[in-house]
């Protein structure tokens, strides 16, 4: 099973850069890169909420479950 992170898709839809998102969310570029490259083991609800607020989306718009 895998969780797919679609931050790049939402960034493109919102015409927003990774740098701009990191600034709005209040996390480092390194941490945002770990998340968007699907290397993160977990995400805080507060971070997920901030990303959704910045991208004006729902958690399901950026996180997707795919079975093996």
Regions found by a protein language model. Give the residues of each.
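Residues within the helices of the helix-turn-helix
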Residues: 8, 19, 49
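The alpha-helix within a helix-turn-helix
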Residues: 11, 22, 52
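Short alpha-helical DNA-recognition segment
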Residues: 16-34
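Residue-level recognition of specific faces of alpha-helices
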Residues: 31-34, 47, 61
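Short, basic-rich loop-to-helix N-cap that marks the start of a DNA-contacting helix
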Residues: 39-50
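Short C-terminal boundary/hinge segments that cap the last helix of small helical domains
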Residues: 56-68
């Amino acid at each position: 099973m895998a969780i797919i992170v679609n931050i790049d898709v939402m960034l493109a839809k919102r015409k927003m850069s990774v740098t701009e998102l990191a600034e709005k969310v209040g996390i480092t570029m390194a941490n945002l890169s770990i998340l968007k490259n699907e290397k993160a083991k977990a995400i805080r609800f507060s971070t997920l909420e901030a990303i959704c607020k910045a991208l004006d989306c729902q958690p399901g718009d950026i996180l997707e479950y795919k079975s093996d």
